[in-house]
Amino acid sequence: MYVGPLKALINDQFRRLEDLCLHAAIPVHRWHGDVSATDKERLRATPGGVLLITPESLESAFINYGNRIPKIFARLDHVVIDELHSFIGDVRGVHLRSLLLRLTQIIDRKPRLMGLSATLADFDASRRFLDSDSPERVEIIQDLESTRSIRVGVRAYPKPSPGSGDPDEEDDGPRIATSVKEVLEDLETITTGAQPERWKAPPVVDEQTALTNLAMDLATVFNKSANLIFTNSRRLAEMLADELNQIATHQKWPRNPFLLHHGSLSKEVREDVERRLKIGEPLSVFCTSTLEMGIDIGSVHSVGQLGPPWSVASLVQRLGRSGRREGESAILRLYSLDEPPSPKSSIEELLCPQLLRSIALVELMLARWLEPFDSDSPQFSTLIHQILSVLRQTGGCHAKRLQELLLSHGAFREVANSHFAMILRGLGSNELIEQMPTGEIILAPLGEYITHAKDFYAAFTGVTEYSIRQGQLDIGKLPETSIPPEGEHLLLNGRRWRVEQIDSRALVVEVVPAHGKKAPFFGGTAGVIHTRIAATMREVLTGKSVYTYLQVDAARLLEGVRAYAKKLRICELPWLDRGNSCLVFPWTGSKGMQTLRACAKSEGIEVDMESISITYRCDSRMIAQHLTRVAEGRFDVETLAASIANKCQDKFDRYLSDELLDFSNSRRILSLADAIEAANGILGRR
């Protein structure tokens, strides 16, 4: 059995394996939502050969064919988990481990597990994932002979605003910079304490906006050969694809080589892009994580990254998509996209944190450092999912059997029995389960309803999406919150559409081509930044190193940012005293920042938190006393977690008690150790 994280990856491997196994008379099967019922039934009737499947489809097998599982997998010898790094420390990973461990108990045999990944650094976590009982028995096989060279360039651009280049958007603000040259001029003026002249000028609608400038650069750099251009949001990908389509039309290009590939586009659109790349067509594709995995798209000359990703691992994974041919270098062009200076700019924004993070990620990548996997979360929501799954599969069982199956011999061995009992009581009080006079636990009507829903197979939270169609053409899907009213416009697949009709029952939006546009909001959350990345950002800001991979504008911008930080003594002073408030740069990761905010809130101190700074609404004396208490570890992390506003993060969290939510959030969102280290650093006790 081959387990892959994406249907597209499974389809790709299926095509390769089917040809490979044809002459050996080894049947190859695939099982996911797009595979016909006939093909699935053929596998269930005569199991054997190779099965390619996603965790969610394996879940559906347990749910819908529970009594046939022993027969289907009776001779399972090997399990290959592709892109192993994408599962470890993640909801889907815990879900997959639970299913595999349940499977071994049902078929009473232990198949050999193998994990494949190009970006693994935390081998201890990888070993535990494959064999919790005896992780020392897991063998690590590394390619230590690889000497592939890499070429990196970092460029700086003002961040395009959502309305950039949109004639329907009114420009009623000050005239702000649209190039790095103008950003530097403004930054130098601000450093002297003055206000840039352009802010005083009347608003100007400038055709050379930040979006157009960036698009023209991309058109110059990526107009030949095959390239992948990764963005951190589908919104930016759509904006740039549309801008380039307008440029191509206006300038009468013979062809527009810029296409899109992301999860909101239809399968047909994505597969067409993959096919054209694979046959060697010179295309540059704006994409998100959908092409980060190992789908076969042929040779890619270079990789673009618009805005730094959240992790070094993601940067390495994306860079690895290029330079796969013998003798070729892997090429990365990283664009930092910071907000241009304006009258509303914060001090943090003037430090260009995107540029600092871009450099920090490259430096850590060159040092061969990758983030360790986060295995602190107890994954209570996924445990609830698996309890419901077992009850649906079996029809009911005793609490002791559930405990043995999922905790003692399953994927939730770290969960205390007391917490497990609290979870069962919570499911009972919420009427998802009920207990028979015999002691057996079964699904209550609400539990039956939940496990029969289409989205139950996934342990992670989904969103309601509408299909976007032009006649019979399926363009893609958009979240419900992104659908504009009838008569208004949207962007999808780099094209402009007008909404003609919305069918809320069928979840379908009918559109026609149009000239107006409105960039869709796809949702999503900010990623988690590791403490070492934040610390490296500080080193970049305070150091004097010259980074040879910085393009001229990026190097000059770093000089300007360093001069501004030096003038304000940002890295010398513990905080910037503003009378009734203090601005602090903790240089810690996301968990440390959240914990510092929670500590302040617990003592009644109001704070405003940005990505790398916190403004404390108090005077210097109070903040010194407060941070001293933080540094001395006088806070209880579960008490801090009780103050978190949005406690429910995962799919079934709403069925957990506050006590369990606080326990979970104290580990998955907060880190008292990081906060203590940061407070000591702020107070000069590093």
Please place each PLM-identified region on the residue numbering.
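A generic structural motif
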Residues: 32, 140-145, 256-258, 263, ...
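Terminal, basic amphipathic appendages of nucleotide-handling enzymes
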Residues: 194, 328, 463, 503-576, ...
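Short beta-strands and strand-coil junctions in structured, solvent-facing domains, enriched
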Residues: 293, 411-412, 497-498, 507-508, ...
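Short, charged/polar, Gly/Pro-enriched secondary-structure boundary elements
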Residues: 159-162, 447-454, 517-520, 621-627
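Helicase motor core with emphasis on the C-terminal RecA-like subdomain
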Residues: 1-59, 63-394, 400-443
